[in-house]
């Protein structure tokens, strides 16, 4: 779903069930993951990972999109798994490559986790990372 006056530059990839709010602008070659939500008036200059909400100027990851996941039919167990993966990726003191390996080790690679990790590994513009204090509060 794309709201009024949202703008996508060239070669942007938008995943299934993603939402882009009004007046949001997405830079060329960015990827918006499946079941992600970009808040209104956000300036997206890096990839928005699957299953997250991004907001701000520039956009940063705010929280796992729990409501969107529920609406898309994800089970509560899958949502817990996704939240755990994001905690490993962004709240531990690990380099991203180490955190990806840790997710694979601790959680495995269900379809949802594989979608997340694939998005990280193929990112060309970098990731719209979380503001750590806010993200820890919202993912914990």
How would you describe each model-predicted region?
Residues 51, 57-140:
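Terminal amphipathic alpha-helical/low-complexity segments used for targeting or macromolecular assembly
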Residues 2-10, 15-16, 20-28, 33-34, ...:
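Left-handed beta-helix
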């Amino acid at each position: 779903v794309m709201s009024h006056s949202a703008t996508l530059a060239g070669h942007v990839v938008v995943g299934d069930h993603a939402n882009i709010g009004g007046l949001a602008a997405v830079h060329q070659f960015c990827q918006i993951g499946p079941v992600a939500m970009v808040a209104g008036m956000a300036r997206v200059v890096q990839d928005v990972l699957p299953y997250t909400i991004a907001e701000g100027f520039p956009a940063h990851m705010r929280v796992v999109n729990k409501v969107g996941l529920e609406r898309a039919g994800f089970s509560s167990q899958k949502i817990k798994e996704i939240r755990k993966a994001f905690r490993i990726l962004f709240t531990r003191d690990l380099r991203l490559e180490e955190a990806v390996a840790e997710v694979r080790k601790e959680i495995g690679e269900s379809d949802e986790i594989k979608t997340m990790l694939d998005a990280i590994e193929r990112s060309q513009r970098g990731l719209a990372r979380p503001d750590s204090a806010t993200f820890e509060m919202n993912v914990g």
